[in-house]
């Protein structure tokens, strides 16, 4: 198992500076990570730094709350794609899910999928804020909207990925979608347990430590 190819090398903290983004991209190339995952303001920088590599540029949309309106999420997505993003990690409207306004949740995702124009869309459902029924309905909405992945967490919602959540999400989407585990993955054992549970992508700021077999405290 080549762990590096499962990893979206992530830097989403609000105080991230250009030098840190440049380091993120250099590390991703050195260690052959699948992508870097950044906020939209850094997409152009990453696209330029990674243009001659196999590392993709992933960015977050509607992050971290998911509470912005659908039109804004679609615009952010279009701008990110135009600037060089190849994958989009969007946050659902969590309140709408809990209100059972499922048409809104689905249409919100669908608007981002359409704006992404064929590029991979991962749907962050923020599992730490959801009960089992919420999680199931969120995954079904993402599936119906035509997204490519469901993703556990933003890393900003008070909790991260768990094996049980990954198993549940995979059981709902089956072979029609993939699952990204993110938040709190700090060592190789955790990473492998998420993959064994059904995850095909891992979002973490600890990718180097993970592939080297260590563990780390703090971070995403």
Curated annotation (Swiss-Prot):
Source species, domain of life: Bacteria
Primary localization class, coarse: cytoplasm
Reactions listed under catalytic activity: 2-deoxy-D-ribose 5-phosphate = D-glyceraldehyde 3-phosphate + acetaldehyde
UniProt KW keywords: Cytoplasm, Lyase, Schiff base
Coiled coil: none
Gene3D superfamilies registered for this protein in UniProt: Aldolase class I (3.20.20.70)
Localization (cell): Cytoplasm
Catalytic residues identified in the record: 89, 151, 180
Keyword Iron: no
CC annotations in GO: cytoplasm
Record-level GO BP terms: 2-deoxyribose 1-phosphate catabolic process; carbohydrate catabolic process; deoxyribonucleotide catabolic process
Keyword hit for Lyase: yes
Biochemical pathway: Carbohydrate degradation; 2-deoxy-D-ribose 1-phosphate degradation; D-glyceraldehyde 3-phosphate and acetaldehyde from 2-deoxy-alpha-D-ribose 1-phosphate: step 2/2
Its EC number(s): 4.1.2.4
GO MF terms, alphabetically ordered: deoxyribose-phosphate aldolase activity
SUPFAM superfamilies, per the entry: Aldolase
Annotated HAMAP family: DeoC_type1 (MF_00114)
Classification via NCBIfam families: deoC
Family the UniProt entry places it in: Belongs to the DeoC/FbaB aldolase family. DeoC type 1 subfamily.
Annotated function: Catalyzes a reversible aldol reaction between acetaldehyde and D-glyceraldehyde 3-phosphate to generate 2-deoxy-D-ribose 5-phosphate.
The name this protein goes by in its record: Deoxyribose-phosphate aldolase
Lineage, top ranks: Bacteria, Pseudomonadati, Bdellovibrionota, Bdellovibrionia, Bdellovibrionales
Gene: deoC
């Amino acid at each position: 198992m080549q762990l590096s190819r499962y990893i979206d090398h992530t830097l989403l903290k609000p105080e991230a500076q250009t030098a840190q983004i440049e380091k993120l991209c250099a590390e991703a190339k050195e260690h052959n990570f699948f992508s870097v995952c950044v906020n939209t303001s850094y997409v152009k920088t990453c696209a330029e730094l990674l243009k001659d590599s196999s590392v993709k540029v992933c960015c977050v949309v509607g992050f971290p709350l998911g509470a912005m309106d659908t039109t804004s999420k679609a615009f952010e997505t279009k701008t990110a794609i135009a600037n060089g993003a190849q994958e989009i990690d969007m946050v659902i409207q969590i309140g709408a899910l809990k209100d059972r306004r499922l048409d809104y949740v689905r249409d919100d995702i669908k608007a981002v999928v359409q704006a992404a124009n064929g590029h991979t869309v991962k749907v962050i459902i923020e599992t730490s804020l959801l009960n089992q029924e919420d999680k199931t309905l969120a995954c079904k909405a993402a599936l119906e909207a035509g997204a490519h992945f469901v993703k556990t967490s933003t890393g900003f919602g008070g909790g991260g990925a768990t094996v049980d959540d990954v198993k549940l999400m995979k059981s709902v989407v089956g072979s029609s979608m993939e699952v990204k585990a993110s938040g709190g993955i700090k060592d190789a054992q955790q990473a492998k347990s998420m993959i064994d549970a059904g995850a095909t992508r891992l979002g973490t700021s600890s990718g180097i430590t993970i592939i080297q077999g260590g563990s780390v405290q703090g971070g995403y």
